[in-house]
Regions:
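Active-site loop-to-helix "anion-binding N-cap" substructures in soluble metabolic enzymes
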Residues: 1-392
Length: 392
C-alpha cells in the first residue's frame, strides 16, 4: 500500500522533531493498517527543497520518530521510485512492515505533478491511501498522480482515518452546525481569508476578527493604525465586508501596542482609536479579550483559525491565549470546537488546552480552502471516502 502522509514537521537545529502532531495524528491509520497485515510504503514531503536532495530537509528524523511510536523498524529508503533497488526492497517487505521514502520533493516533478513520477510511485503499491490532509489542496505527483496511476490499473484510492476525520469536522462545522455558531479569524492578512469570510458570513451567528488582519478593517473604519501592518489594497474590500456583515462581525475595541514588536517591548493598552503614529498593534486588549471570550464561551460550534496577536512574544500573547482558554471552556461545556491548523494549533498547544478541544486540523492552507468551498485535488482523486463518496 502506498500511503501519502503529511510529515512536514518542524525540526530543531539538531534535527529533532519539535512538534510531532502531524506524525502522531497518523498513528491510528498506521496501527489499523499494520493490524490488517498491510505492507506500507509511506510518502511525504518536508520543507521546500527545489527538486534535489538537501540534507536539512531529510525525513530521517521522522523515520526515527515513527520507529519509536510504532515500536518497530521504519527504514528510510533513499533510492528513487522506478529504480530497481527500491522495487526490490519493496518486494521484500513482509506483512505489517513500514518503510518511509526519502523526501519526495527531493525529486524533480513532484510539485508539477509529473506523470512519470506519479506512475513510478503508483507502481509501488496496489492500493493508494491518502492521509495527507495538509497537502490535499495541492495537485502533486505523490498524491494526485500516484492515486490516478493506481486507479488506472484497477486499484482503489482510499482515505485514511485522519483524512476522514479532518473532512468530517471541517465540513460539519459549516454544513450543519449546532448554534450559536461562532467563527474566530486572525493572523496577518485579510487577503488570504477573504474567500473564507465570504463563505462563512451567511453561515455564522458571529464572526470575530482579530490579529493583524483586523488592522485593515480598522483602516476601513477610518481609524489610525500607526505603523501597524495594513493591506492598503484590501481596505475597500474590508469596508464592503463590514457593510454586508453589520453587527454579525465583531472587531477588537482595544489593542496592545508598542513601538517595536519584540520580547522586551514596552507595551501599553489603548482603545482602537488611540494608536499612536509610531506604534504597532501586537495584540487585542483586555476588554476585547473578555468580549471575544464571552462570545466563544456561548457558542455551541466554534471554528478558530489564526492568532489574535504575536503570541510567540510574551507581551502580545494574552489575547490569543484568552481565546484558546475560552474555546476549551466551551468544549468542556459540550460545544464542538475546530481549530484550523497552522499558528492556531501551535497556540492551542502553547496555551495548554489542545487536549480539551474537539479537533485540531493538521492542515492550515487545506482547511482554509475547504472552508472557502474550494475543491481539494488530493481529496477529489479518492474514490472511497467514508460516506461522502468519490468526486471523480
Amino acid at each position: 500500500m502506498l500511503a501519502r502522509m503529511d510529515y512536514n514537521v518542524p525540526l530543531s537545529p539538531e534535527g529533532a522533531v519539535t512538534d510531532p502532531i502531524r506524525v502522531d495524528s497518523t498513528l491510528p491509520t498506521l496501527d489499523h493498517l499494520r493490524e490488517a497485515g498491510a505492507r506500507i510504503i509511506l510518502v511525504s514531503h518536508l520543507g521546500r527543497p527545489k527538486g534535489s536532495p538537501e540534507p536539512r530537509y531529510s525525513l530521517a528524523p521522522v523515520a526515527r520518530l515513527l520507529a519509536q511510536r510504532l515500536d518497530a523498524d521504519v527504514p528510510l529508503l533513499t533510492d528513487p521510485p522506478g529504480s530497481d533497488a527500491l522495487t526490490e526492497r519493496v518486494e521484500a517487505m513482509e506483512d505489517g512492515d513500514v518503510v518511509l521514502l526519502e523526501n519526495i520533493r527531493f525529486l524533480p516533478g513532484e510539485t508539477e505533478n509529473d506523470p512519470d513520477l506519479g506512475e513510478a510511485l503508483g507502481r509501488l503499491g496496489e492500493v493508494f491511501l491518502g492521509d495527507a490532509f495538509g497537502a490535499a489542496h495541492r495537485a502533486h505527483a505523490s498524491n494526485v498522480g500516484a492515486a490516478r496511476a493506481i486507479r488506472d490499473r484497477g486499484g482503489p484510492a482510499v482515505a485514511g482515518l485522519l483524512m476522514e476525520r479532518e473532512l468530517r469536522f471541517l465540513r460539519e462545522a459549516v454544513r450543519d452546525p449546532a448554534r450559536p455558531f461562532v467563527a474566530v479569524l486572525g493572523g496577518a492578512k485579510i487577503s488570504g481569508k477573504i474567500d473564507v469570510i465570504e463563505a462563512l458570513l451567511p453561515q455564522v451567528d458571529r464572526l470575530i476578527v482579530g490579529g493583524a488582519m483586523a488592522n485593515t478593517f480598522f483602516r476601513a473604519l477610518g481609524l489610525s493604525t500607526g505603523a501597524s501592518l495594513v493591506e492598503e489594497d484590501r481596505v475597500a474590500m474590508a469596508g464592503e465586508l463590514l457593510e454586508r456583515a453589520g453587527e454579525k462581525l465583531l472587531l477588537p475595541v482595544d489593542c496592545v501596542v508598542a513601538t517595536t514588536l519584540d520580547a522586551a517591548a514596552d507595551s501599553r493598552t489603548v482603545s482602537r482609536d488611540g494608536v499612536g503614529e509610531g506604534e504597532r498593534i501586537g495584540d487585542i486588549g483586555a476588554t476585547s479579550q473578555e468580549l471575544f471570550s464571552r462570545e466563544v464561551r456561548g457558542a455551541r460550534t466554534c471554528l478558530w483559525n489564526g492568532p489574535m496577536g504575536v503570541f510567540e512574544l510574551a507581551p502580545f500573547a494574552e489575547g490569543t491565549f484568552a481565546v484558546a482558554r475560552a474555546l476549551a471552556e466551551a468544549t468542556d461545556a459540550g460545544a464542538i470546537s475546530v481549530v484550523g491548523g497552522g499558528d492556531s494549533a501551535a497556540a492551542a498547544v502553547a496555551a495548554d488546552v489542545a487536549e480539551r478541544l474537539t479537533h485540531i486540523s493538521t492542515g492550515g492552507g487545506a482547511s482554509l480552502e475547504l472552508l472557502a468551498g474550494a475543491s481539494l485535488p488530493g481529496v477529489d482523486v479518492l474514490d472511497q471516502l467514508g460516506d461522502e463518496g468519490g468526486n471523480e
